Structures are given as C-alpha cells and as structure tokens.
Design a protein with these regions (language model features):
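Substrate-binding/active-site clefts of carbohydrate-active enzymes
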Residues: 1-9, 13-49, 56-178, 200-206, ...
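Structural preference for beta-strand elements that scaffold enzyme active sites
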Residues: 7-11, 50, 93-97, 183-185, ...
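Basic helix-extension-helix modules of the SAP/HeH family
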Residues: 482-541
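Active-site-proximal helices and loops of the catalytic beta/alpha 8
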Residues: 86, 90-92, 116, 177, ...
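Conserved, mostly hydrophobic/aromatic
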Residues: 12, 43, 53, 69, ...
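Active-site clefts of carbohydrate-active enzymes
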Residues: 270-292
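Carbohydrate-interacting/catalytic domains
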Residues: 1-52, 58, 88, 259, ...
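Active-site groove signature of glycoside hydrolases
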Residues: 104, 168-194, 277, 281
C-alpha cells in the first residue's frame, strides 16, 4: 500500500502561521519558514505523519495569486530554507505535500505581464482564457479575461494549451527535484480541465514513487475526480458539513446518510474512493466556533479519525482555538501562532491530549485505514459502526446526548475488547457486547490481543468540564436569505445561468429529494462561485 493510505495529515497555512505580511513588496527574503521547525516535533507528538502546507510560492498577497512557481515566497524565505524544512520533516518520517495553484495565476505572473505590455502581439495570449481586447476591467488594463470566482486578481490559465500544460508539468518536476516533495494538493480542482489533470496524474505516476495528488472539490460526484486516471483523493466537504451540523442538530442520521452515500459511491470498497476528511481548514470557520455545544469536539474528532477516509487536523484546532470569517476576510481563519504559547499541550490541554490519542490509535489499527465499514446502530443521538480488515474488527461508538447511554452491539466473534480511549475491557456475551457511552463522548473498541497491546485511558471529562463553564449557545451565523432567489429560472444551459439561478436550481433539486433544512440552504447560499455551482447542479442524478 502507498504511504497516503495510512496518512494522518496536519494542515499548515504558512503565511498565516508565521505572521508574514499580508501583501508582498518583493523585498529580500525573510526566513520565516524556520519558525515551523519546532512544529515538526509537535505534529509527530499528536500522531500525524504527513503535512499539507501551502501556498508556498512567490505571490502578491494571500498566496493563491502566484507570481513565480519556482521561488519560495520571499516573505517565508528562499528555496534553501524550504529544502531544509522538507528535509527536516523527512528525518522524522513525515511526508510533505505542497499546495499546487495550477488553475490560475496572479497578475504579476510573467506571462500575464507580457500580455499587458504587448497586448495582441504577446506570444502568451493563448496562455489565458477568453482574453478580449475590446473589453476592460477594474484595473483599466484595456482588455478583459476569464478569472476564478469573479476575482480579476486570479487570472484563469488556458489548461488546453500544450505550452501551459508543459510549463506546469515542468514546475512539478522542479518541485520534486529541488524540494523532494511527496505530493500536491490541487487548488480549485473542481473547475480545472479534466484532461489537464490527467496529464498531471500521468507525471505523478512516474515522477516519484507514490506521488500523491489530492484535489479541492466542494460538491458533486467525487468519483469524477478521484479515480485511477485523475486524482488519488479529493476534499470531503460533504462529510465536513455533516459532522458539525449533525451534532448541532442532534442528528446522526445526517452523518450516517452521508457516509453511506459516499461509501456506496466508492462501490463499497474503503479504498475505492479515497477522501481527505477534515472538520475545518483555511477557508471555513474553525470547528470549535461552529459547534453549538463545545463538548461535541470529542465525538466529532472520534468520527474524523475512524470513518473511511484520510483524517486531517488544521493547525491550531487541536488546541481548541476559535475562528470565524469576519467582514468577508479569511484572516481570522489563518492566525499567527507561537508554539511556545501551547507548551506541553499534549499533557496540559485535554483536547490536544484526546486528539493525540486518536492519532496514535489510528496509526496502530490497520482496520481504521483499510477496513470495510458496517453500520451497527443509529439513532438521532447515538451512532455505532465497525471497521474490519483481515480479521481485525474495530467498533466505534459516539453519543451526542447530554446523558450517558447503554448500547448493545454485535461482537463479530471477538471475545474481548478494550476501549482505546477509556481503557475499559468489555467481554462478549451471547455474541454481543454492551457498552456504556459517556455523554458527549464515545470510544473505539479494539480486539484485546498481543498485537494491539494495552491502552492507557484518556480522561476527556476534563474537556467536558471546561465546556460546562460556558453557556451552551448556538454559534452566531447569519441565516442567508433565500427570498431573493428568482421564482422562475430561465430555460438556458447551466453555464449561462446567474449565480442566483444556479442556487435556486440546486435548492429545487434538493427539495425533490426530501426536506431541505436551514443548514442545507445556508450551504447553498454561501457558495457564490459560478463554476462550482455548475458542477454541483450537474451532480444531481
């Protein structure tokens, strides 16, 4: 199996974590990336064995407006500094994947600057999409062009141009030869050309053993992207949404339905559809901020580490930090952190201790990486399932209620289990085990044998006690008003519809499938990206 099948990712947004200036003046490099070195030990301590880091390369602002793909952003240092960071990670057996922003470039990118200077005579006009020298934009370029997400700061690359394809493939070869990177996360993969991505996959298959490609996909049929010809994995936004709303609404049916649908999409094969599971990242609110009852941090993370897929922790969330978008800005989601402020967190911070335990449990159990999934019991407030591979059967239980509960579950021919979090030994009787699941908690029951060994209990009651000091209140989220959506939608191709028409279509198709909750409406209304909405509406069957 490949390394990524057993990966436990730690996600770093380096410009934020290191406190780099928001705008790049392209001055002399400042080695801020060295500030990440102490984090390597911490990342290993919490049981992660892979880092997704980015964006990294020279850009004008947030990192996604690339200026130079072969030069580390000068706000972070120079190429030698990045080489050292990756080498230090590899010494600790930690893999590293970079953020590959290959859908669009920044306005300072050399080829776009040539178009600005030479207009129709530029040899690079074919590198970009839909350049119109009769148009204009807010920069008064005297021409218009296709962008990403309505932002002219991000210039869409023509991904069917052989020169563009070869240029990006050369960038990837350079990243491997120069930095020894282990894979790439493709930004905005859900709006990238499929043949373009297949060319990237073709290179990935030969450029380095087990070179990993993971794509950012918001909605749709994930198998269109994650397959043997395109990408190895995609971001699991569907589960991300279900994990927090399923707890906020005390509705484990939403989570189980999501898991079953994704598992069926993969043909019932746990490795048939590799998904990158997460509860927060650099684009969405922190999980601690999204949860109405902060005690649900425990069952949420138990599920993150035990459901099919590859788990990921976003830097700082293991400490329980908060973060919401403010005035449309992502800055509060990408804060500067000093690891010294969280010294000995794996001993002193109860939440960090639980997440570290989950990482180590995941590392020791092949069933949690490779095992099949079977739902055992489901109510609004309790959920149990098993993961099984090569005779190893693991049972996972979670409870979102404020009271303990008893659950009786099939033992699957295992005579004795041990709770990996509680340390509790459970004996099977009559082919079943009966377990007491703590309020706002859960456990992972592993077969007691010599291979798995003994487990020291993790007392997550301290997390719950801290939460009890806070008033249980709903996270303040403005409900998006759907009354502004058009009553009638034009009979035109989806590509020609407005954002509002696409949103109305999606909500209408959701209604055809059943009740549409406020959470579902809000998810639709928060997506204002035309290409993403087109992909979403086309995913309904």
């Amino acid at each position: 199996m490949a390394w990524y099948d057993e990966a436990r990712f730690y996600h770093i947004y380096p410009l934020g974590l290191t406190g780099a200036p928001q705008n790049n003046d392209y001055s002399e490099p400042v080695n801020r990336i060295k500030e990440l070195t102490p984090w390597i030990k911490h990342i290993k301590e919490i049981g992660c064995n892979a880092i997704y880091i980015g964006p990294l390369f020279q850009s004008g602002s947030h990192g996604y407006d690339t200026t130079d793909y072969k030069l580390l952003d000068s706000r972070l240092g120079d190429n030698e500094d990045l080489k050292k960071f990756v080498k230090d990670c590899h010494k600790e057996d930690i893999k590293v994947i970079f953020d590959g922003v290959f859908n669009h470039v920044g306005r300072d990118f050399f080829a776009f600057q040539d178009v600005k200077q030479n207009r129709e005579n530029s040899r690079y006009t074919g590198w970009f999409c839909n350049i119109n020298f009769w148009g204009n934009n807010e920069y008064n370029d005297g021409f218009s062009y296709e962008n990403w997400g309505g932002h002219n700061l991000l210039v869409k690359l023509n991904q069917r141009n052989p020169e563009v394809i070869n240029y990006i493939l050369d960038v990837i070869r350079f990243w491997v030869s120069e930095f020894d990177v282990d894979g790439i996360r493709l930004d905005a993969a859900d709006v990238m050309d499929f043949d373009y991505m297949k060319s990237i996959r073709g290179l990935a298959n030969v450029v380095k053993e087990d070179f990993y490609l993971m794509g950012e996909v918001i909605h749709g049929d994930y198998t269109r992207w994650a397959n043997n010809d395109t990408l190895h994995a995609v971001t699991n936004y569907t589960l991300h949404k279900a994990l927090y709303s399923g707890h906020n609404e005390h509705n484990y049916f939403e989570i189980a339905h999501t898991v079953n649908r994704l598992y069926d999409m993969a043909g019932g094969n746990p490795l048939g559809l590799r998904l990158y599971n997460f509860v927060d990242n650099h684009d969405v609110a922190r999980i601690y901020s999204k949860l109405s009852n902060k005690a649900h941090m425990i069952p949420v993370h138990i599920l993150l580490y035990t459901l099919p897929g590859i788990p990921s922790i976003y830097y700082g969330s293991e400490f329980g930090i908060e973060g919401n978008k403010e005035n449309g800005s992502d800055a509060s989601l990408r804060p500067q952190l000093n690891l010294k402020d969280y010294k000995d967190a794996t001993d002193k911070n109860p939440l960090t201790k639980v997440i570290a335990a989950l990482g180590k449990i995941r590392a020791k159990s092949p069933a949690l990486s490779y095992g099949g999934y079977t739902q055992l019991q489901l109510t609004n407030r309790q959920y149990a399932f098993s993961r099984n591979v090569n005779g190893e059967n693991v049972i996972v239980v979670v409870n979102n209620d404020d009271n303990d509960c008893m659950m009786t579950l099939p033992s699957n021919s295992v005579e004795e289990y041990v709770g990996a979090l509680s340390g509790e030994r459970i004996y099977a009787e009559g082919g079943n085990i009966t377990v007491n699941v703590k309020a706002c908690g859960g456990d992972i029951y592993l077969p007691l044998n010599d291979v798995m060994g003994e487990y020291k209990p993790v007392d997550y009651s301290k997390v719950l006690k801290e939460v009890e000091k806070q008033a249980k209140k709903k996270v303040k989220e403005e409900k998006k008003d759907t009354s502004t959506l058009p009553k009638k939608v034009r009979n035109v191709p989806y590509e020609e519809m407005t954002v509002e028409e696409l949103q109305a279509c999606i909500i209408g198709k959701m209604r055809n499938n059943g009740e549409v909750t406020d959470e579902m409406k809000r998810t639709v209304m928060e997506n204002v990206y035309h290409d993403s909405l087109v992909n979403w509406v086309e995913s309904f069957r």
